[in-house]
Amino acid sequence: QVPTSPLDQASATLAYFAEQYRDVMARKLNRSNVSLLKQCEACTQTKLGVLSEHFWAIVYFLLRCGDAVSAHDVVVMHGADSIDPAVQRLVASLAQAQGSVDNLWQGSTYRITLDSGDRQGVADQVESLKRTERPNMYQVGVYSLLSGQQPLTSSDTVEGFKMIEDYLYSALWRAVMVANPVDELIELSNKILTLGPSHFQDASGWSFALPLLATQ
């Protein structure tokens, strides 16, 4: 069934970007011969009560793949005693919204709503996380998605943040979870048009065509 409403179109685009990223990660894991299980086991490593970078990387990758259920499982198994309760509740809400499907955005015909107080509480921590001596950009990425902060910009510290698809995924994620998602989607579309091709500095014209198509 072809999505017709702006919200359904945005959800379908999010589902596509999530599946695409899942394929990218699967290829990387196959090439490096590193199992996801071994990576998850690394999540249990802590230092001075602070969760390891591996933990936040896996939670970020799972949310980026649209798998909030698995992200919630990782949080419960490895970090429940060390994570801000607001973060736990937000991930749990996303997992509940996903239900039994493989992708949070798969067949979604409703607007996912998250507690505004929890989102604001997480948002208040984003800037302080960035100002730490060695900020964990995966944690910043998770907090940014959950709180609905402005879309992630490219980062030299996290390879996954460099792709235009990551920008669009986070931008659409934010747009569909506000009180007036249609207005937010229109604003995002207008922003892409205003920025123009020069903002998306890739040699191919596809670097601008992709955000243009994804937000129309």
Show the residue positions of the predicted features.
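Eukaryote-biased recognition of long, low-complexity, charge-rich segments
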Residues: 92-137, 141-145
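Extended amphipathic alpha-helical scaffold segments
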Residues: 39-97, 208-216
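Alpha-helix boundary/N-cap detector
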Residues: 5-8, 12, 82-85, 117, ...
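Intrinsically disordered, low-complexity acidic/proline-rich regions
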Residues: 1-38
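Extended alpha-helical solenoid scaffold regions that build the rod-like backbones
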Residues: 56, 131-216
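Alpha-helical repeat scaffolds
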Residues: 14-17, 33, 37, 106-124, ...
